Amino acid sequence: MTNPIHIVGGGLAGSEAAWQVAQGGRTVVLHEMRPVRATDAHHTDGLAELVCSNSFRSDDANGNAVGLLHQEMRSLDSLIMRTADAHQVPAGGALAVDREGFSRAVTAALEDHPNITILREEVAGLPPEDWGSTILATGPLTSPALAEAVGTLTGRESLAFFDAIAPIVHRDSIDMGKAWFQSRYDKAGPGGTGADYLNCPMDREQYEAFVAALIAGEKTAFKEWEASTPYFDGCLPIEVMAERGPETLRHGPMKPVGLTNPHNPTVKAYAIVQLRQDNALGTLFNMVGFQTKLRHAEQVRVFRTIPGLENAEFARLGGLHRNTYLDSPRLLDATLRLKARPQLRFAGQITGCEGYVESAAVGLMAGRYALAEAEGQTLAPLPPTTALGALIGHITGGHVEATEEAERNAPRSFQPMNVNFGLFPPLAQMPRNETGKRLRGPEKAALKKRALTDRARADLAAWMTGERLPHAAE
C-alpha cells in the first residue's frame, strides 16, 4: 500500500491540492483544524471558506491576467473553478459566487471523494517525517504553533507577521519626460548600475498638497483581529508618517538628497518619490516606502498627483495588514518544496501570493508536483508565458534581491502579489494594426493583452501535451 499524501489546511489552496492528488489516483489525508481550533476570520467549519469578498475578480481571459488564470485552471480540472462556475452570482464581468453554497459544494466534493480522508484536527507543529510527502497550505492565519515551528526550521526572519505592501506601477505607464533613472548618490549596489531607481520630483507646493491629501484621504479600518498587531519600524503607513509632521516624509522615504533631475538640473527638488524595480523583467516598479491604508480609489487619486505618475497604471495597490508568508524565493525550490526539508511543500497565501484564485492556483500546482513526485515522474517547468508559470515564477524566483538601501525602506524585497501582466515576459514584438502601424492608447493596451493571452494559451496547450513550446525563443 502506498503512503498517502498529507495536506495541512482546508482552505482554497489545500482543497485544490487535495483534489488534484486524489483525481490522479493517490490517496490524500486532509487535515483541517476547524472546528477544533477556530481563527479570528473564519465563521464556519466549511472547507474553502471565503473569509472576505465573494469575488474571484475578472473572468475576462483575453484582457485580464486573473481571467486568464481562471481559464488555465479550468483546463487543468480545478475543483475551485468548477465549483465557482456552478455557484456564480451576477457580478458584471467578474466571477462572484454564493460563498456559502460554494464552500458547501467544495466540502461535499472532497468528503465524497473515495481517495480523500478528512481529519478535523490541529497540526500543532511540523508534520512528523514519517508522513512523507506533505503540503502545508495553512494560509495567512496559520496557527501560532505551526508558525513557530516553521519559523524555527527556516529562520525566524523568514516569516513576516505584519505585511507591508507598497503600490506597484507598470513601468510603461510612467512619464519619463518627468521621471528619470538614478540611484541616490549614483551608488551602484549589488547587481546595480547606479541608475536603478525611478525618481519623480516635487516642488514645495506639490509636496505640501500631497501631504495634505494623504492626511485627508479616506482610510481602510483595521479588521478586529488586526487592530492589536503593532507596527514594525519599516512598516509605518505613509499617511501615519505624514501625520507626525509636515516635513517627516521629505526626511524619510521622499528625501531629495543625492539626486539630480536631468530634466531641470539647476533646480533642486523639494521632495522625491522613488520607485524600485520589483520583478526580474523590469516591467514593474514599486513605490518605495509607500505602504498605506488609504482606500484603493483614494490611492489612485492621490498617487496620480505625483509628477510622472499622472497616468500611472497600478499592478497592485498598497496595503498594510497582518499576514504570515514565507520568503519563498530563498526557501522554496521550483516545485514549491522547502529546501531545508524537501518532504514539505507549501501552497497558497503562505507562499506569498495574494488573492483567492492565486492561492487555489498555487495549490493546484503543489498538488500536481506532489502527485508527479509520488509517481516517480517530473513535471516539465511551466512556461513563464502562462499565468500559472508567471505566478509560480514570481513565488520561487521572480523577485529582485534587496539592496542595502532597499532594506532600509522595506521589510524585504519579496512581497505578496496578485497575478498581473507585469509578471509575464514581454512580447517579442508589439502588436500593430492591419496596416502595420504602431498603435497607441487604449487600442494598443487591448491588443497587447490579447497577444499575451493568446501566447499563454498556446504555450499552456503545448505544455499539457508535451510538445515543444511555439514561443520558447521569445
Curated annotation (Swiss-Prot):
Keywords: Cytoplasm, FAD, Flavoprotein, Methyltransferase, NAD, NADP, Transferase, tRNA processing
Disulfide bonding pattern of the chain: none
GO biological process: tRNA methylation; tRNA wobble uridine modification
GO cellular component: cytosol
Principal subcellular localisation of the protein: cytoplasm
MF terms in GO: flavin adenine dinucleotide binding; tRNA (uracil(54)-C5)-methyltransferase activity, 5,10-methylenetetrahydrofolate-dependent
Binding residues annotated for FAD, in chain numbering: 9-14
Reaction equations catalysed: uridine(54) in tRNA + (6R)-5,10-methylene-5,6,7,8-tetrahydrofolate + NADH + H(+) = 5-methyluridine(54) in tRNA + (6S)-5,6,7,8-tetrahydrofolate + NAD(+); uridine(54) in tRNA + (6R)-5,10-methylene-5,6,7,8-tetrahydrofolate + NADPH + H(+) = 5-methyluridine(54) in tRNA + (6S)-5,6,7,8-tetrahydrofolate + NADP(+)
Its EC number(s): 2.1.1.74
Record localization: Cytoplasm
Family annotation (Gene3D superfamilies): FAD/NAD(P)-binding domain
Cofactor annotation: FAD
Function: Catalyzes the folate-dependent formation of 5-methyl-uridine at position 54 (M-5-U54) in all tRNAs.
Protein family according to the UniProt entry: Belongs to the MnmG family. TrmFO subfamily.
UniProt name for this protein: Methylenetetrahydrofolate--tRNA-(uracil-5-)-methyltransferase TrmFO
Protein source organism: Methylorubrum extorquens (strain PA1) (Methylobacterium extorquens)
